[in-house]
Each structure stands twice: as structure tokens, then as C-alpha cells.
């Protein structure tokens, strides 16, 4: 399990960016506008997710156990939705920045393709006694719940372009 601050994700090769965190009812929204990057970030399929003029919008619902990250290109077209399964979300006491407790499992939505990623990481953490059986089971239950709510959960189906 890893504590993830919203301000830290997907900015490794980014030289200049603007970031805005706002509260929208019972969720925090983090908008990252990529101004200048040393090199574009692409996934193994070749899909570029981080480049100059792109946006990353993260919605962190405080009453749910996930974080939804949406990648948009320079035309504000949605490239991918990436859902991190978490054991809980909150506000970091030291930095006052929203965070989620990442529990390895991710759900990735590209066009009409949906798949669960990093099951192997969850299995490895369980086998190496890095997480308990209870945590392992909870992560799988949360993941299955998210999968069943993909078309109805207000945070997942939200058109994030309204935050840009």
C-alpha cells in the first residue's frame, strides 16, 4: 500500500505545469495542465498520455475507495481513464494535500476496452506478506464493485472537461 498525493502523479519528465486543486461537493478535483515536458510519456501501446498542452484531471471522492484519473490531449479529447483502487482517501496532515492509499489494482478504460491492471503486484504483495489477507480480499472486492458501477458511478462517468 502506498500513499499517493494528487500533486505528485505523472509529472516525472514535466518541466513546467500548472496545477489547481478544488473541492467539488464530496470530492477533490486536481487539474494538471502540462505546459512543457522533456519528453512525451506514452504507454506500451504507443498511446501518448502526457505531452505539451495535455491535461490530467483527477477526481478523488472522499466517500469512495478509488481515484479516477482522466488524460486529455491538447484538443481536450479523452485519451484514457485510469482508476486507482484505494483503501481510503483523505487529506494529508503534513501537506494538506488530498491523497489516496493505493492498493496496487487499477482499472484502465481505453475507448471501449476495460481491463484490470497490476493484479500481479497485488498477488506479490500478498505472497510476500506486505499486505494481509483481509487487505488482499478488500482490494478485490473494491475492484469488482468499481467494475460493476462503471456506467453509473457519478465520479467515473463525469465529463471532466468542465474543470478545465
PLM regions: where:
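Charge-rich, low-complexity N-terminal segments
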Residues: 1-55
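Short small/polar-residue motifs
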Residues: 11-19, 64-68, 102-104
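Beta-strand-connecting loop/turn residues
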Residues: 26, 64, 112-113
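The feature represents the first ordered module of a protein
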Residues: 40-95
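Conserved, surface-exposed functional patches that form binding/active-site neighborhoods
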Residues: 75-129
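Short, surface-exposed, low-complexity cationic segments
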Residues: 121-146
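Charged phosphate-binding loop/patch that engages nucleotide di/tri-phosphates or the phosphate backbone
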Residues: 138-164
